Amino acid sequence: MEEMIEPLDRVFLQLGPFTIYWYGVLIGLGVIIGYVMASRESVRRGMPKDTFSDFVMYVIPVAIIFARLYYVIFRWEQYADDPIRVFYIWEGGLAIHGALIGGVLTAYILTKKRQLSFWQLMDVAAPSILIGQAIGRWGNFMNQEVYGGPVTREFLEGLMLPEFIINQMYINGTYYHPTFLYESIWNFIGVVVLLLLRRVNLRRGELFFSYLIWYSIGRFFIEGMRLDNLMIGDSLRTAQIVSILLIVGALLLWWYRRAKGLATERYLDPHQPARTNGNKKKTKKKKKK
């Protein structure tokens, strides 16, 4: 039976010399759905119109570049002999932690320039980021990557998985854990959790911290099952180290901002422009008069 199993076609569409892969289509779909969610929520929160459409133009390209650089840095041995392959992103190899670094840095710079609340923006974006990740993992599925250790077909059938998933997990003569699916499900559940937390009316920044904590917990354990890990040396899994740092960092920032009285505004509070030094000086001058 196994001899007849063929992997799903990675190509979504062929237009003359141009090939569109499922990997890019699914990542793009995740970005679009995430953008629509965030854009609608930003309007409900009273943020300036077209805030997210403006930000997406900068954040997404930078996030993709950082995602690729992050991956290539930890897998340079694959590209050293043929560096042009660094640009072959349709083959896979975009690291979410790299995308987060690039995206968050870009968002921080833009919010400061436009006098918007960075924490409000990240809170609004948090569920959208997670749903984008959940959908994007199916791009890994189409590429037959992000899989775990070997298992039997009976094990996969016991999970009540559809036939097409079971067959796609048959790689080079062996069945593997569909860790892409575990993470995708974890992320979809996380989206629901974050949407429920919106109603709790956390202080600004704390919904984003909740996202970092939720995603990192799942990623830490699922990463331990994977065989294609990015590594530091021979024994340290990069994603597990970064996940621990994100959890600790999010908890510390959560505590620090509350302890220092920096987290005064809440998620459901109406939008207000971010305070700047210039605004503070003007306020002081008015008081003197």
Swiss-Prot record:
Residues involved in a 1,2-diacyl-sn-glycero-3-phospho-(1'-sn-glycerol) binding: 137
GO MF annotations, alphabetized: phosphatidylglycerol-prolipoprotein diacylglyceryl transferase activity
Record field: transmembrane: 18-38, 54-74, 86-106, 116-136, 177-197, 205-225, 236-256
Family: Belongs to the Lgt family.
Source organism (scientific name): Halalkalibacterium halodurans (strain ATCC BAA-125 / DSM 18197 / FERM 7344 / JCM 9153 / C-125)
Protein name per the record: Phosphatidylglycerol--prolipoprotein diacylglyceryl transferase
Alphabetized UniProt keyword annotations: Cell membrane, Membrane, Transferase, Transmembrane, Transmembrane helix
Gene giving rise to this polypeptide: lgt
GO cellular-component term (any): plasma membrane
Membrane topology field: Multi-pass membrane protein
InterPro entries according to UniProt: Lgt (IPR001640)
Main location (coarse class): membrane
One Pfam family linked to the record: LGT
